[in-house]
């Protein structure tokens, strides 16, 4: 039997089991754990499209119709990177969802075929490419609609949060308050190739105004200190969430006016909620909001400006905070409020808590102390910095960083999906899930994706001059594709709503075009359900020195002086 070398094989069909590759210009290396395309029994039955290649009539392309099982699209020889594994496989898409992960081809001429390529099957060649689930950003201030395109080009395909545009309340808080505003935002969602879900305002001491927002379709409620996150408001909001199977997100009381972190924890009575910017620079009880990392009912996340900790982090935060929270630098009390939230000791500890799997999620805090297009970049920069400073994680080897890669990718894919009750639809590369997939060249991984699919159809891509004779000539930049136009928008993306809203027929009442999907199974979620990120240590924060300990271990690290995934990728 004729053979070829591993390098030649990888260049032709992409890496196979045992091959390794570097993620962008980081120190992170992943190794292919398995090759599902070998279900044919051995090498030699790979499928590939092109002149003189195998996906031709009577070869790897069968005569089967769609009704007989042929896929709508097959992504060939992809390197899937997800929380469950790092594997080589073909990916079959059908009806906007992931249908099969395995071996594609023609069952009439090839053994071990899991998915059928037919005359009606499109091919996306992924040889040498990484495929991930679309990212989920669960802390969005919907300040301007242009955020959505920015996020999509970064590899984010689901945005959850609140707001009504550049209103003062939205600058500071992720709330879409009241049924009228909620209706308008749900109607606006139809225009974008992005899965969207909205949070109502949760700050109220009586339930009626909260129920009317959930009945209007919000997926949860946001408690924000700028609206008064008192123990009474916390308890009432969680009462309503428990009754409606919706989530609560909390930005707690930085000034400790209505109570301390102990009072907030007590007010939850063990009921589940999401703790945004758990370190506290983005807001929350000063200086010890990090204590909630050790609570099973708090699902902790970080917003990206503090991640990772660098020599520039502290300097940019005071001005950022003054603008976002409508503060006046000429008022001493406002300046003191801002400075109380910026603590190098807790920011340094935040990096390590992510590496330990104690903080479970990443998000942006878009335009409100966060950068909407940098969730994925900063996740992997943090992973790189922690490998440099802390070395290998248990479970990794001298050959690879697979466990660290799975831990960090889970922070912006499966874990926010679980936390917000949408993991039945999105958050991973698994059969049955909505086909929101991102294709990356390894050298550009986490920075600039090549192709972004929404519901199995290409919605955004790095594309060259439309007047050129081929697709690749400069200027190459992100351009909306056909999945981002016309009726394809509504067919390719979901709007997440409450079950109460679905029951109230908001689709018809509000005249919504997108498919509505109800959030579910939220109230039983605990920290232990955060994949690869379920560590709940006993947290201690010294009120005088701000030093942080987890299970007695002092958490401190140096700020990074330089980072990968930065200037060399953004010359233009």
UniProtKB/Swiss-Prot annotation:
Catalytic activity: urea + 2 H2O + H(+) = hydrogencarbonate + 2 NH4(+)
Domain of life: Bacteria
Alphabetical UniProt keywords: Cytoplasm, Hydrolase, Metal-binding, Nickel
Sites bearing N6-carboxylysine, chain numbering: 222
Xref: SUPFAM superfamilies: Composite domain of metallo-dependent hydrolases, Metallo-dependent hydrolases
Main location: cytoplasm
Binding site for Ni(2+) 2: 222, 251, 277
GO cellular component, one term: cytoplasm
Entry EC no(s): 3.5.1.5
Cofactor(s) demanded: Ni cation
Domain (Urease) ranges: 134-572
Post-translational modification: Carboxylation allows a single lysine to coordinate two nickel ions.
Keyword Hydrolase: yes
GO terms assigned for molecular function: nickel cation binding; urease activity
Binding site for Ni(2+) 1: 139, 141, 222, 365
GO BP annotations listed: urea catabolic process
Active site (catalytic residues): 325
Locations listed in the record: Cytoplasm
Pfam families linked: Amidohydro_1 (PF01979), Urease_alpha (PF00449)
Similarity comment text for this entry: Belongs to the metallo-dependent hydrolases superfamily. Urease alpha subunit family.
UniProt subunit comment: Heterotrimer of UreA (gamma), UreB (beta) and UreC (alpha) subunits. Three heterotrimers associate to form the active enzyme.
Name of the protein: Urease subunit alpha
Organism of origin: Polaromonas sp. (strain JS666 / ATCC BAA-500)
Gene: ureC
């Amino acid at each position: 039997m004729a053979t070829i070398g591993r390098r030649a094989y990888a260049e032709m069909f992409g890496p196979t089991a045992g091959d390794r590759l570097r993620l962008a210009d980081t120190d992170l290396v992943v190794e292919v754990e398995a090759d599902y395309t070998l279900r044919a029994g051995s090498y030699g039955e790979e499928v590939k499209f092109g002149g003189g290649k195998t996906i031709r009539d009577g070869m790897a392309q069968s005569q089967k119709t769609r009704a007989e099982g042929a896929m709508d699209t097959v992504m060939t020889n992809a390197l899937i990177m997800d929380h469950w594994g790092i594997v080589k496989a073909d990916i079959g898409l059908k009806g906007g969802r992931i249908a099969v992960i395995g071996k594609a081809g023609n069952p009439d001429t090839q053994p071990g075929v899991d998915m059928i390529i037919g005359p009606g099957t499109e091919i996306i060649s992924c040889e040498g490419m990484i495929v991930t689930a679309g990212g989920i950003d669960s802390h969005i201030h919907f300040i301007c609609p242009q955020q959505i395109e920015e996020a999509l080009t970064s590899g984010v395909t689901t945005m959850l949060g609140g707001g009504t545009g550049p209103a003062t309340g939205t600058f500071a808080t992720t709330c879409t308050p009241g049924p009228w505003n909620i209706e308008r935002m749900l109607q606006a969602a139809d225009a974008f190739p992005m899965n969207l879900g909205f949070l109502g305002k949760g700050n109220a001491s009586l339930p009626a105004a909260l129920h009317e927002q959930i009945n209007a379709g919000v997926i949860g409620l946001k408690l924000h200190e700028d609206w008064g996150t008192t123990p009474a408001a916390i308890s009432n909001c969680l009462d309503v969430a428990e009754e409606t199977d919706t989530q609560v997100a909390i930005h707690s009381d930085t000034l400790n006016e209505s109570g301390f972190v102990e009072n907030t924890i007590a007010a939850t009575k063990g009921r589940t909620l999401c703790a945004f910017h758990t370190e506290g620079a983005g807001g929350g009880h000063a200086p010890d909001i990090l204590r909630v990392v050790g609570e099973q009912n708090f699902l902790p996340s970080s917003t990206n400006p503090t991640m990772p900790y660098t020599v520039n982090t502290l300097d940019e935060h005071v001005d950022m905070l003054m603008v976002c929270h409508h503060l006046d630098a000429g008022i001493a009390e406002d300046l003191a409020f801002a400075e109380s939230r910026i603590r190098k000791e807790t920011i340094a500890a935040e990096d390590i808590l992510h590496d330990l799997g104690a903080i479970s999620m990443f998000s942006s805090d878009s335009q409100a102390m966060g950068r909407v297009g940098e969730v994925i970049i900063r996740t992997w920069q943090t992973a790189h910095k922690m490998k440099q400073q802390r070395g290998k994680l248990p479970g990794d080897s001298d050959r690879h960083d697979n466990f660290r890669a799975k831990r960090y990718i889970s922070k912006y894919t499966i874990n926010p999906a679980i936390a917000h009750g949408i993991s039945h639809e999105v958050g991973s590369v698994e059969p049955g899930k909505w086909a929101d997939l991102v294709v990356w060249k390894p050298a550009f991984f986490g920075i600039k994706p090549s192709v972004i699919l929404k519901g199995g159809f290409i919605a955004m891509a790095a594309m060259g001059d439309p007047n050129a004779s081929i697709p690749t000539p400069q200027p190459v930049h992100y351009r909306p594709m056909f999945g981002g136009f016309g009726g394809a928008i509504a067919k390719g993306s979901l709007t997440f709503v409450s079950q109460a809203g679905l029951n109230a027929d908001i689709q018809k009442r509000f005249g919504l075009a997108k498919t509505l999907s109800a959030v579910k199974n939220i109230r039983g979620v605990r920290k232990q359900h955060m994949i690869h990120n379920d560590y709940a240590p006993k947290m201690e924060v010294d009120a005088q020195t701000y030093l942080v300990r987890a299970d007695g271990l002092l958490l401190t690290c140096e700020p990074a002086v330089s980072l990968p995934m930065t200037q060399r990728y953004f010359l233009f």
